[in-house]
From Swiss-Prot:
This is Clampless protein 1. The keyword Transmembrane helix does not apply. It comes from the Eukaryota. Required for developmental progression after cells of opposite mating types fuse with one another, essential for processes common to both dikaryotic filament formation and monokaryotic fruiting. A direct target for transcription factors Sxi1-alpha and Sxi2-a. GO terms for biological process: sporocarp development involved in asexual reproduction; sporocarp development involved in sexual reproduction. Keywords: Glycoprotein. Glycans are attached at residues 70, 296. Disruption phenotype: Expression is not seen in haploid cells where both copies of the gene are deleted and there is no discernible phenotype with respect to haplotype growth in strains with complete deletions. However, there is a complete absence of sexual development and strains fail to form dikaryotic filaments/spores. Where only a single copy is present in a wild-type and mutant mating pair sexual development is indistinguishable from a wild-type mating pair. Expression is up-regulated during sexual development. It comes from Cryptococcus neoformans var. neoformans serotype D (strain JEC21 / ATCC MYA-565) (Filobasidiella neoformans).
Length: 472
């Protein structure tokens, strides 16, 4: 191996002696490169007067640059970021285009099936008592004709037209109802006249007046006191859980009920049937059969619902003593004659009582148990559309009870029957609409001759509403 002497090195220390070192070939080459590079003097770095990108680094060899890293300017970083963003977007687009469309979710099918099962569940009706056969519900209620009220059975009012009396009473009826309902019965207070039978009268009084808390109420109630005590009960043969006794002003009933004089007449017909009639042996169910007839129903057809029938009975008249007059004793108790009022549906008598004392108030909300402002068909449908058939049948039973009471009392005001018919059409229409929706029938498929009933219009309106909800 050859041995070289180290060449002279130019440095700042020129006066220092160069040592004699024996070098190998590799060491000599490495030392030569280092000494050659060390002799290169870089020019002075100029100061930048203003902001800028600066000067790019100067390279001679990757390992021997004047800076230990590659300079990355702001423009370079911006370009690099733009390229990366573009590549990410292109990859996402390719990935999105290559993805397959998602299959139909089974959850949607389950939702449709659960909705169908829920509709079937709501369409079930469980009557409180077994009903033999099928229950036929008419699309409209029959409207029987009632006799006109010719006079008021009162010695001071016989010569005055009934309509005139009623028109003068209409503004006073709400206050009469408030006062009469404030009277409470006191069964332990005897009648001041010992000759009066005990069970023929009943003592009433306003508790706040009797105990002295509000004695001024007695002056306000003067002229509007009740004159009759009604024991509201089921008709004979239908059972009863107890009668409801309420004090009333008989004039409010006498001016609006065609059959009211039957309760106060001195001669009461007692039927003696020749043979049992089919109506007498029929068993009453939760929803008795109602035969749908034309509107011009005769009085004879209605007489079958009363407690006697002139065609099949021998009527015997017996004279009964006239009802005792109302008397107020010295303690402030009002002794009223007690009269039993047998009606088909005592549970719906409060609706009748309120309607007779508030004739200008809408009856439709009371019939369906809705707030007072629900007076149109659209509002009623909004309220009852979500009810089940079980709940709708309960409302239908209430409506039928009101219908029976109207027929029994002889209330024939046209406005009353129109509102009852509208309530009946709304409830029956929703029940029929549920059947149409379950069966999948379309309105165009139904062939019909003649005019639609109100219940049919409600049924198809309900179906259209439900289909619109399903599409949302």
């Amino acid at each position: 191996m050859a041995t070289y002497l180290a060449p002279p090195v130019s440095s700042n220390k020129e006066n220092s002696p160069a040592p004699n070192i024996a070098l190998s070939d590799i060491d000599a080459i490495s030392l030569s490169l280092r000494t050659s590079l060390s002799g290169v003097t870089l020019p002075a770095k100029k100061k930048v007067a203003a902001l800028g990108l600066g000067r790019a680094p100067k390279f001679t060899y990757r390992r021997h640059s004047n800076k230990p890293y590659n300079r990355s300017t702001s423009i370079t970083r911006a370009k690099k970021a733009a390229v990366q963003t573009k590549s990410v977007r292109s990859k996402a687009a390719v990935k999105k285009s290559n993805t397959r469309p998602l299959p139909l979710k089974l959850v949607q099918r389950l939702d449709v099936e659960s909705a169908r099962l829920e509709r079937l569940r709501k369409a079930v009706w469980n009557p409180p008592a077994p009903v033999p056969g099928q229950v036929r519900v008419p699309l409209k209620l029959p409207y029987p004709r009632f006799p006109s009220i010719e006079y008021i059975d009162n010695e001071y009012l016989k010569e005055i037209p009934v309509q005139y009396i009623f028109d003068r009473m209409v503004p006073l009826l709400p206050s009469i109802a408030t006062i009469t309902l404030a009277y409470q019965p006191y069964a332990s207070i005897p009648h001041p006249d010992s000759k009066i039978l005990r069970d023929t009268t009943l003592a009433f009084a306003i508790p706040e007046v009797i105990d002295g808390r509000k004695p001024h109420w007695a002056a306000k109630a003067r002229g509007r006191e009740p004159d009759l005590a009604l024991a509201v009960a089921y008709k004979s043969g239908e059972g009863s859980n107890g009668n409801t006794v309420v004090a009333v002003n008989s004039l409010a009933f006498a001016t609006q009920c065609a059959y009211w004089p039957r309760l106060l007449t001195t001669s009461i017909p007692i039927p003696t049937p020749k043979r049992p009639t089919p109506s007498a042996s029929a068993v009453s169910t939760s929803l008795p059969a109602i035969v749908e007839t034309e509107e011009n129903v005769s009085d004879a057809s209605f007489s079958s619902s009363s407690s006697w029938s002139d065609s099949d009975s021998e009527v015997e008249f017996i004279d009964l003593p006239r009802l005792p007059r109302p008397v107020k004793d010295d303690k402030g108790f009002l002794h009223l004659p007690l009269v039993e009022l047998p009606i088909p549906s005592p549970s719906t008598f409060p609706i009748i009582h309120r309607h007779l004392h508030h004739p200008s108030r809408a009856l439709l909300p009371d019939l369906l148990g809705l707030p007072e402002h629900y007076t149109t068909r659209s509002q009623v449908l909004d309220a009852i559309s979500g009810l089940s058939v079980q709940q709708l049948m309960d409302k239908l039973t209430t409506l039928q009870g009101v219908w029976q009471n109207l027929c029994s009392l002889g209330i024939g005001r046209l406005g009353t029957w129109r509102q009852l018919g509208e309530a009946w059409a709304c409830v029956v229409g929703v029940i029929a609409g549920q059947g149409l929706l379950i069966a999948g029938q379309e309105e165009a498929e139904v062939q019909r001759t003649g005019r639609k009933t109100a219940a049919e219009d409600v049924a198809w309106e309900w179906v259209r509403r439900e289909k619109a909800k399903e599409q949302q």
